[in-house]
Amino acid sequence: MSSLRRLLLLLLLVFPATLLLRVGPGGSLAVAQDLTEDEETVEDSIIEDEDDEAEVEEDEPTDLAEDKEEDDVSGEPEASPSADTTILFVKGEDFPANNIVKFLVGFTNKGTEDFIVESLDASFRYPQDYQFYIQNFTALPLNTVVPPQRQATFEYSFIPAEPMGGRPFGLVINLNYKDLNGNVFQDAVFNQTVTIIEREDGLDGETIFMYMFLAGLGLLVVVGLHQLLESRKRKRPIQKVEMGTSSQNDVDMSWIPQETLNQINKASPRRLPRKRAQKRSVGSDE
């Protein structure tokens, strides 16, 4: 029993000593080394982030420059400062659907070199987005040379589609020309939102069909009434009118007594006036 107690006391003394030796100065060094390694990794990550931000800041100006260059390359040609254009709509700025719209474009060369007017085109576009074409008309080839200090006039006409009536659209009219050096120019002579007017004059297909339908309906009504009247006339019974007897021979006189017949014959109106007339004539002679 005493030996067991001694062993337990020895273990109790040895075990804390071993723990102190393991976690002592060596353990603190390990923890310190771990902390320094973590700090180094954090500092390295911060430095890398700063380098990335610097690279992004350096790349931004180059990207903007590239975007500007792309815009310059992909952008449409502009008008030349040495040229001037005007437009005149022949029938005013009214655009009736399914009707001819005609306008004149004047070109003035104010420079010292010749300009070659190549073509004239027009198109209807979506009002909210002019990049979306609604109706694109055929370009008119011109190929006309305009000398310096000279003017030229060009005529163009188009027909708005009938379904576009009553709606607003963007009308774009472009005049394309170039100089002798090959520089291409484009002048937007007209670039505004216009409203297509619905045609009210004349007869369209729907109106003609409606009139024909009404005429046919009226004809059917007339024919029906005529047939109804004819059928009613046929159904009416013929009323018999009593005509009476035209002569006494048609009357059966056998049932009348003979004496009565003799009196009737004696007092007949045809014979009495004659007898009276004869008596009067005899009396006058006397």
From Swiss-Prot:
Note: Seems to bind calcium.
Post-translational modification: Phosphorylated in its cytoplasmic tail.
Phosphoserine PTM positions: S247, S268
Skewed-composition ranges (Basic residues): 268-279
GO CC terms in record: endoplasmic reticulum; endoplasmic reticulum membrane
Record's function text: TRAP proteins are part of a complex whose function is to bind calcium to the ER membrane and thereby regulate the retention of ER resident proteins. May be involved in the recycling of the translocation apparatus after completion of the translocation process or may function as a membrane-bound chaperone facilitating folding of translocated proteins.
Signal peptide: 1-20
Sequence intervals crossing the membrane: 208-228
PANTHER family (alphabetical): TRANSLOCON-ASSOCIATED PROTEIN SUBUNIT ALPHA, TRANSLOCON-ASSOCIATED PROTEIN, ALPHA SUBUNIT
Keywords: Calcium, Endoplasmic reticulum, Glycoprotein, Membrane, Phosphoprotein, Signal, Transmembrane, Transmembrane helix
Modified residues (Phosphothreonine): T260
Compositionally biased intervals (Acidic residues): 37-75
The keyword Transmembrane helix appears for this protein: yes
Subcellular location: Endoplasmic reticulum membrane
Domain free text: Shows a remarkable charge distribution with the N-terminus being highly negatively charged, and the cytoplasmic C-terminus positively charged.
Membrane topology: Single-pass type I membrane protein
Residue intervals on the Cytoplasmic side: 229-286
Domain of life: Eukaryota
Protein name: Translocon-associated protein subunit alpha
Source organism of the structure: Bos taurus (Bovine)
